Amino acid sequence: MLVHQGAGAAETTTMKIQIEARGKKWTISLENNETARALYAKLPLTLDMEDLYGRELCYRFREALPAREVEMRGYEIGQVVYWPPRHSFVILYRQNGEAFDMQSVGRVESGIDELAQLGDAKARLTRAE
C-alpha cells in the first residue's frame, strides 16, 4: 500500500487510483514501490485498455516505468501489475494458473467481476480522493 506523508508526521493517506470506463468506476489501492509512484505521477491518463487472453485488461506504455522488484510468480484475481518486457499496465481479472515476471503495483478494491466484463475500452485514470 502506497502511503503519502503530509506536512504533519501523523498525517498519512493511502495513494489510490480511480478508473472510469463506460460510466462505471473502480478504485485501485497502490503498493509502496517505485513503479506505483511513477504511475501515480503520470495521472490523469486516458488509456485504450485491451482485453487480452480472457484474463486481463492491458495498456502498453511507450516508455518504460521503473521496475526494480520484478519477480517470477503467480498472481491473484484483482491484482494490478506492471509487465516490463512490453511496458504493460495490467489488471488481472481471471485466474489461469500462469506465472510470469511482474512488478506488483496494487489491487482493485472491489467490483472485479464488473471489470472483467468491460472488454476493450477507453479508461480514464485519475487520483482518487
Question: Where do the protein language model's features map onto the residues?
Answer:
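Beta-strand-rich cores of mature extracytoplasmic or soluble domains
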Residues: 84-108
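Loop/turn positions that initiate beta-strands
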Residues: 78-79
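N-terminal secretory signal peptides
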Residues: 11-60
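Short alpha-helix capping/helix-loop boundary micro-motifs
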Residues: 65-69
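Well-ordered alpha/beta subsegment
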Residues: 18, 106-129
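Cleavable N-terminal signal peptides
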Residues: 6-8
